[in-house]
């Protein structure tokens, strides 16, 4: 299908910010490259107008939003719910809620239409991890986790089955500062891949959420300085590539915008990274290939505030 578009910062949870100037070509170019590498150049991303029809001209019938909110209560105080009300998705997926189900903010009941709400959080770690799925339509079936005890202790996955697809929202484990959880992350990646492959063999799959990896160099601002940092190690990038191939799944944003640079979904709170757009693309909508004819658009709402991540939106014509 026709393509619609046209190349970092540090993994979340506080890894050090590194920048590296590009190769010098001339004095003027060198200054410009140095500024852009330091996050000071005009390397901003403008979300283009929403495309609400499929390649065949069918109008979009489903709108899904995903957002790592970095704590539900703080996100609500920062007016995150106002954005959701304006965006008006059919399904809303939230990650890093940091909130047990019995302590959910009452304001969540004010979301118009999103009355079917499902939550998962660690049973023994208040204020850590957690995901939510809110829907206008009642799913046929909802389950939690990936069926593997090692990986189902931290409230990271919700699966909702609908008539024509299965939706998985996930908050993938971070390899951590100093890569202290990289080995665990690799075990997770393998188990998650097998789980998703099983789901996708029965019904078309949509996977969304904070997948905690920038797949290619175009997906973060300073790739050279982050190859040994969580979110951009060779192991994590390889694991993501294997996920795409084995399930198989397509990265909806790169399918439509293969060469669009500076399109990020996460910015560390340090060093004014967001205002300089020194970011990472860690949040994704991945689709079964059979859903690509229904893909209308995959959006990065980079101007929406309320978290160190921004929301992303998917339009499908089902």
Swiss-Prot record:
The modification S-nitrosocysteine is found at residues 65, 93, 310. Changing residue 212 to A: Abolishes AP endodeoxyribonuclease activity. NPM1 stimulates endodeoxyribonuclease activity on double-stranded DNA with AP sites, but inhibits endoribonuclease activity on single-stranded RNA containing AP sites. Residues 2-33 are annotated as: Necessary for interaction with YBX1, binding to RNA, NPM1-dependent association with rRNA, endoribonuclease activity on abasic RNA and localization in the nucleoli. Gene3D superfamilies: Endonuclease/exonuclease/phosphatase. SUPFAM superfamilies: DNase I-like. This is DNA repair nuclease/redox regulator APEX1. It comes from Homo sapiens. The lineage of its organism: Eukaryota, Metazoa, Chordata, Craniata, Vertebrata.
């Amino acid at each position: 299908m026709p393509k619609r578009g046209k190349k970092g910062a540090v993994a979340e949870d506080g890894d050090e910010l590194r920048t590296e100037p590009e190769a010098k070509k001339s004095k003027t170019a060198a200054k410009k490259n140095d500024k852009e590498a330091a996050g000071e150049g005009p390397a901003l991303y403008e979300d283009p107008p929403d495309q609400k029809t499929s390649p065949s001209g069918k109008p979009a019938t489903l709108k899904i939003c995903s957002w790592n909110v970095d704590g539900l209560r703080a996100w609500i105080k920062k007016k995150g719910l106002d954005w959701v009300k304006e965006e008006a998705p059919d399904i809303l997926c939230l990650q890093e809620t940091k909130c047990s189900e019995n302590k959910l903010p009452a304001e969540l009941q004010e979301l118009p239409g999103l009355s079917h709400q499902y939550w998962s959080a660690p049973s023994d770690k208040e204020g850590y991890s957690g995901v939510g799925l809110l829907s206008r339509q009642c799913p046929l079936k909802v389950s939690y986790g990936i069926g593997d005890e090692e990986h189902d202790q931290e409230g990271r996955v919700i699966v909702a089955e609908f008539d024509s697809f299965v939706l998985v929202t996930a908050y993938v484990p971070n390899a951590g500062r100093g890569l202290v959880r990289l080995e665990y992350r690799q075990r997770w990646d393998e188990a998650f891949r097998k789980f998703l492959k099983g789901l996708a063999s029965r019904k078309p799959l949509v996977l969304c959420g904070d997948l905690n990896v920038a797949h290619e160099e175009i997906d973060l601002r300073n790739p050279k300085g982050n190859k040994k940092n969580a979110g951009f190690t060779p192991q994590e990038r390889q694991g993501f590539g294997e996920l795409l191939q084995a399930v198989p799944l397509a990265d909806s944003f790169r399918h439509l915008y293969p060469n669009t640079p500076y399109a990020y979904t996460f910015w560390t709170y340090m060093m004014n990274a967001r205002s300089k757009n020194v970011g990472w693309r860690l949040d994704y909508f991945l689709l079964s290939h059979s859903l690509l004819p229904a893909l209308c658009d995959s959006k990065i709402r980079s101007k929406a505030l309320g978290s160190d991540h921004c929301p992303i939106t998917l339009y499908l014509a089902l």
